[in-house]
C-alpha cells in the first residue's frame, strides 16, 4: 500500500508539472522580450494584389522594433501564404497557435479564410484582431467575443452609395457589376437595403469572377440597359479594365467605385486618368497616390517608412497603406496593454479604443470600440476624382446610420 501510495503521489506530481509546463508554454506567446503575432495573406493566388497589406504590416513592425519595440518587447510577425484557400487557412492557423504559440492573430486577409478559422480561435480564446474584411460577421462580440474587424462594413458602404444616389440622382436607373464573393454580395446587399422599396431602380446586376474573361460582354450588356448610374464592386485590376472598357464604349454613366479599388495609383492611373475623371467612391484612408497629401506630415512619414522599411513596395499602393494603418492600430492596443499581455487583456484593450486616429485616416475618421462595439471604423467620406485628386463630397458619414429614407 505504501509503495502504491508513493507511486500515485509521484504520478500526481508529474501531472501537475506537465500542466505547469503547458501553462508556461502558453505564456511564452508574450514574454519579457518578444510578442508573437500570427497572420495569413494571399501572397499567391487570385487575390495576390492585396499581399502588400501583409508586407507593409511586416515592415511596420520592423520599424517599431528598430525604435525599441513595445514596452521593451520586440514584435515577431509570423505571416504565411494561404492562397485565399479556407482549408489552408485553418491548417496554417492551427500551426501558428499550436506550434508557433502566437499571442494573437492579426489582420488576416479575406472573408472565407477568416470565417474558416473563427470558431477555432474563439474556442481556444485566441484574439482574432482587425480582420482585413468588411464582413459584418466579424463585429459580433456576443457570438464571437474573440474576433474583431477593423474597416467599415461592405454592407454599410453599399447603403452609403444607395443614399447618395437617392439624394443626388433620384429616380435614375442603376446597373451593378459585382464580384461573385462575400465582398461583392455584401456590398450589393447594402445597395438594395439602402434603396429600400426603390430597388426597381436597379435594371441589371451581373456577378463576375475575379478571372472573368467576359468583362467586355458584361459592360456592353450594362450599357444597353440604358442605365445612367454604374456601380462597380471588385478588385483594383478588374476595376481598371472596367473603367477603360466603359470609356471605350463611349458610355459615360455616373460611375461609383467600391472602396477596395478606390486607388489613384493601382486603379485609376492604369485605367487612364482621363477615363476615371468623375468616379465617385467612399473612403476612410488617405490615398497615397493623391497629390493633395504631398505636404501632409503623416504622408511624409509614410514615404520615409516606405523608403527605409519597404523599398520594394509601391508608394502609391492603397493596400500597403491599409496594412500600415492597421498595424499602427494594433501597436496602439499593445501599448495600452502595458505589462499585462494576457490574451484577455489584449481583447480588453482592443475593446477600449477611444477616438483613436491612425495617422493616415481621412480627417474626421476615428477608431472607437467598447465591449459591445467590435466595429472599430464606422465612418467614411464620399469622394470624387477630378482627374488629379479626390475631392470630398459632404461631411464624414456614420456608416452605422446610413439607411436611406424610403421615398
Give the ranges of each region predicted by the language model.
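Periplasmic-binding protein-like
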Residues: 96-109, 129-131, 173-178, 226-236, ...
Amino acid at each position: 500500500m505504501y509503495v502504491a501510495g508513493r507511486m500515485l503521489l509521484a504520478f500526481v506530481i508529474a501531472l501537475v508539472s506537465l500542466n505547469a509546463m503547458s501553462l508556461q508554454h502558453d505564456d511564452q506567446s508574450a514574454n519579457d522580450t518578444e510578442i508573437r503575432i500570427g497572420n495569413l495573406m494571399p501572397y499567391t493566388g487570385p487575390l495576390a494584389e492585396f499581399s502588400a497589406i501583409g508586407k507593409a504590416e511586416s515592415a511596420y513592425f520592423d520599424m517599431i522594433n528598430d525604435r525599441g519595440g513595445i514596452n521593451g518587447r520586440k514584435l515577431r510577425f509570423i505571416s504565411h501564404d494561404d492562397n485565399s484557400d479556407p482549408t489552408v487557412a485553418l491548417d496554417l492557423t492551427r500551426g501558428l497557435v499550436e506550434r508557433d504559440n502566437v499571442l494573437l492573430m492579426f489582420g488576416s486577409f479575406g472573408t472565407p479564410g477568416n470565417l474558416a478559422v473563427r470558431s477555432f480561435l474563439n474556442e481556444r480564446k485566441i484574439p482574432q484582431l482587425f480582420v482585413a474584411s468588411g464582413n459584418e460577421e466579424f463585429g459580433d462580440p456576443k457570438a464571437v467575443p474573440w474576433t474583431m474587424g477593423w474597416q467599415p462594413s461592405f454592407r454599410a458602404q453599399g447603403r452609403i452609395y444607395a443614399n447618395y444616389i437617392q439624394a443626388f440622382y433620384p429616380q435614375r436607373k442603376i446597373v451593378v457589376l459585382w464580384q461573385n464573393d462575400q465582398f461583392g454580395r455584401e456590398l450589393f446587399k447594402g445597395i438594395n437595403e439602402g434603396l429600400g422599396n426603390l430597388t426597381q431602380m436597379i435594371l441589371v446586376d451581373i456577378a463576375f469572377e475575379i478571372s472573368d474573361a467576359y468583362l467586355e460582354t458584361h459592360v456592353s450588356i450594362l450599357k444597353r440597359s440604358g442605365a445612367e448610374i454604374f456601380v462597380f464592386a471588385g478588385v483594383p485590376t478588374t476595376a481598371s479594365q472596367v473603367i477603360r472598357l466603359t470609356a471605350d464604349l463611349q458610355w459615360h454613366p455616373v460611375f461609383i467605385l467600391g472602396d477596395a479599388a478606390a486607388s489613384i495609383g493601382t486603379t485609376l492611373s492604369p485605367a487612364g486618368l482621363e477615363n476615371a475623371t468623375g468616379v465617385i467612391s467612399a473612403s476612410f484612408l488617405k490615398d497615397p497616390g493623391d497629390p493633395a497629401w504631398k505636404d501632409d506630415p503623416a504622408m511624409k512619414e509614410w514615404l520615409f517608412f516606405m523608403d527605409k522599411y519597404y523599398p520594394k513596395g509601391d508608394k502609391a499602393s492603397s493596400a500597403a497603406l491599409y496594412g500600415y494603418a492597421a498595424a499602427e492600430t494594433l501597436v496602439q492596443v499593445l501599448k495600452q496593454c502595458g505589462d499585462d499581455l494576457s490574451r484577455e487583456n489584449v481583447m480588453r484593450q482592443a475593446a477600449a479604443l477611444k477616438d483613436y486616429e491612425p495617422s493616415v485616416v481621412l480627417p474626421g475618421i476615428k477608431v472607437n470600440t467598447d465591449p459591445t462595439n467590435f466595429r472599430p471604423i464606422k465612418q467614411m467620406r464620399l469622394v470624387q476624382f477630378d482627374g488629379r485628386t479626390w475631392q470630398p463630397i459632404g461631411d464624414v458619414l456614420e456608416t452605422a446610420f446610413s439607411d436611406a429614407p424610403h421615398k
